[in-house]
Amino acid sequence: MPIITLPDGSQRQFDNPVSTMEVAQSIGPGLAKATIAGRVNGNRVDACDLIEEDASLEIITVKDEVDGLEIVRHSCAHLLGHALKQLYPQAKMAIGPTIDNGFYYDIDLDESLTQEDLEKIEKRMKELAKTKYEVVKKKVSWQEARDTFESRGEPYKVEILDENVSRDDRPGLYHHEEYIDMCRGPHVPNMGFCQHFTLLNVAGAYWRGNSDNKMLQRIYGTAFHDKKALKAHLTRLEEAAKRDHRKIGKQLDLFHMQQEAPGMVFWHHNGWSIFRDLEVFVRDKLNEYDYQEVKGPLMMDRVLWERSGHWDKYADAMFTTSSENREYAIKPMNCPGHVQIFNQGLKSYRDLPLRMAEFGSCHRNEPSGALHGIMRVRGFTQDDAHIFCTESQIQEEVTSCIKMVYDTYQTFGFDNIVVKLSTRPEKRVGSDEIWDQSEEALKQSLESMEIPYEIQEGEGAFYGPKIEFTLYDCLDRAWQCGTVQLDFNLPGRLGATYVGENNERLVPVMIHRAILGSLERFIGILIEEYAGFFPTWLAPEQAVLMNITDKQSGYVQEIVQKLQKSGIRAKADLRNEKIGFKIREHTLKRVPYMLVVGDQEMEAGEIAVRTRKGKDLGKFKVDDFIAYIQDEISSRKLNLEE
């Protein structure tokens, strides 16, 4: 006789084990019709799963924008599998999980799927969903599940059972009419909930993400509760495609990638200009917040990486080389090198906090399938910093780091920032006392600045709690960039100590701090955020001067030289082309200011100024324009509207 407690505190008693759907039906037919699944004592369950003991229950409906939508998307992945097996009976099904904003299914199929094939598959999915057939869940023994998929010729499902499912477990088999899939669930009770979806694209993916395994075909899709939300998402995807940093990078001559150096960036002059301006900006912040800038070696002996613990955890992601019977690893991160710098010379508590920053050139052997333009690379520059401090200094230093993060992001126009605090995991180093003190210090730092945050219980690293900063761009995409991570482990492993007030040797706390993360990735984010319309201070070309006839050529060149001497990235366009043609061309290149000179301007010692978005700013004396643009550059104004 389970007693079910609902979110409003009311209780309902049942004579027999009861399902979420039956509870919903007891409340009303409208709720039952909208019910997708349940959350029993905080755990998601299928609407048909029986509740045998007293429990709290939340009914998940179509209006649930988090769990409800994820369940719909997961069920759409099964629907995709259903359609695929009808159209391609020879296909071998691998996995079909949800991802941010959608789902995918990995399949083993000899023929390569095209966009036309995706349209055919989507059409079949819609035909199936239109029937609103019921999804039937059956819990079976491990052996029965294995026999089921072996008889159906599904080797990937069999492998999952053999390697990932306990023999004592009872896997859930979901019957979609003649199609059967295996999943933890939950899933929708019927396909009437899966009406608003589309397939997006197909790509290659190694089975289990291992390049030693077979390359499968991964079909991506997305789904929403209603047609309006789906349409809005597809519009965002279209806008994202227009803003693709790879496309704009080529258009603006910023960088390129090539097969001979996978995951390594070839920076062109225009792109390197942006990179250097970012470095200058970060250096200004480092000076403002009292950091020392250092530079560590690109590679170090394997012995050091073994002592730091990185060899055990990151060896597969590290590039190595050897010389004179010694093995070296190219650094994937800067922290062990910074500890070596700290260790040079005796340190006192009076020397702390010591803030050490580096534009570290790091390399990680990312899988080739994961590489993506300059967003996911193998060679990158990290705006890394490490703060060595005492336990009593943690809160003050963390607060300073948080201020620096917000100062930086606001300069680029990122105001929507989600903050997450990850607390101690079960397996960890350090005393409970230091964890208590550190977690409280992180909380106090955030609360003192009135910053809302989410707590991720048990998600901290084994060596310390951390704060993560995720910024959202103009398309509402999340980018996790900033991190403030406490470390009670590495300094001790690498022998870092300082002399305390009582002349005892103590191990400092280390704070790992990144703001932009990888400069390459952050530039990619900026390209897509601004669609190539960089603020003037970042723009590779800040002004272009154009003559109307050859008569003004000399005057234009004089002005260009004057602008350049004033620190403005300016150039002349003296081509024998119509002025409208030249303006259009430089507009496409996103040059912030186009300066036009005709006879009238030359005689008056002026220039006609217009922005790349077509706004006419009128005529300026040359010195007045220099003062105008210098103010915009030095103050790092966004000026995105112009």
Swiss-Prot record:
The TGS domain, residue ranges: 1-61
Subunit structure: Homodimer.
Name the record gives this protein: Threonine--tRNA ligase
SMART domains found in the cross-reference section: tRNA_SAD
Binding site for Zn(2+): 335, 386, 512
Location(s) in or outside the cell: Cytoplasm
Keyword terms: Aminoacyl-tRNA synthetase, ATP-binding, Cytoplasm, Ligase, Metal-binding, Nucleotide-binding, Protein biosynthesis, RNA-binding, tRNA-binding, Zinc
InterPro entries: aa-tRNA-synt_IIb, aa-tRNA-synth_II, aa-tRNA-synth_II/BPL/LPL, Anticodon-bd, Anticodon-bd_dom_sf, Beta-grasp_dom_sf, TGS, TGS-like
Pfam families associated with the record: HGTP_anticodon, TGS, tRNA-synt_2b, tRNA_SAD
Provenance organism: Vibrio parahaemolyticus serotype O3:K6 (strain RIMD 2210633)
Cofactor note (record): Binds 1 zinc ion per subunit.
Domain of life of the source: Bacteria
Principal subcellular localisation of the protein: cytoplasm
One Gene Ontology term, aspect cellular component: cytosol
Function noted in UniProt: Catalyzes the attachment of threonine to tRNA(Thr) in a two-step reaction: L-threonine is first activated by ATP to form Thr-AMP and then transferred to the acceptor end of tRNA(Thr). Also edits incorrectly charged L-seryl-tRNA(Thr).
Class of the enzyme per the UniProt entry, highest EC level: ligase
Cofactor(s) listed in the protein's UniProt record: Zn(2+)
GO molecular function, one term: metal ion binding
Family stated for the protein in its record: Belongs to the class-II aminoacyl-tRNA synthetase family.
Keyword ATP-binding attributed: yes
